[in-house]
Amino acid sequence: MLEFVFFGFFFLSILIFIMAYWPKKPMTRAPQPSAVSDLSRPRNAVRAVQGNSTARRALVIGNGAYTSVERLKNPANDASAVAGALTRLGFDVVEKHDLGVLQMQRALRDFEDKAEGAEWALVYYAGHGLEQNGRNWLIPVDAALTRATDLPDEAIPVERVLDRLSGGRKLRMVILDACRTNPFLARMVMNGAATRAVTHGLAAIDPTHGEVVFYAARDGSVAADGPGSNSPFATALVKHMEEEGVELGRFFRKVTSRVLKTTKNKQEPFVYGRIPDEDFYFKPPK
């Protein structure tokens, strides 16, 4: 009896040993997505980059409600007309009206982020502007400007506007309907300020490659606010922006020709800068 138990226990031990160490067939798992593949092709990120790289973005500012000089009646209408046209043409538009100096600084800082990586970054400004010693300034509605030395504290230099567009990939454009007669000049004279270097209109500018600045009137001359609800310059801009298939260089020529005709050759818009060697359209041909 003891022998039977012993041999039974012996064979059971051998069986357990064989089962424990017999080679097992490896388990198969369903194929998993490659982590490297997922990281190299993030669908949402690619979409975002493509969308940003082809975007056309614009900041539109109309300053008319000046607090220390007579108000301008047309900049609000001009800004709304241009913003509307750009929106219809597919631009992502930010429209601002009657900004003080801090508000203008903030609007430009915010737009710098928005313009980053955009194919076409554009700023349109309607309102007062002036030139001092060859440097151009845009005038916020809360500016007093009793002395020429007030400009750095109370106005926005045009080169700062261009700096805020530096993230645009292909074309960076500033359109200025700001060459109006300077009412601040008389205030400076009355206060005995040295005004020899402060003039009406804007000075010539030399943007870098890929930057274009379009003045409502050429350097040293002034632009009309216009007898209607919009300035002659804004009227021409909107008309020719929405013409299909007008390449950018031709657009500038058509706007200039229309303003000259409307003002009986008293106002000549002017373009400064170098357009990249590529065709640009506000409304591309079909």
Go through the PLM ranges and name each one.
Residues 1-286:
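Cysteine endopeptidase catalytic domains of the caspase/legumain-like
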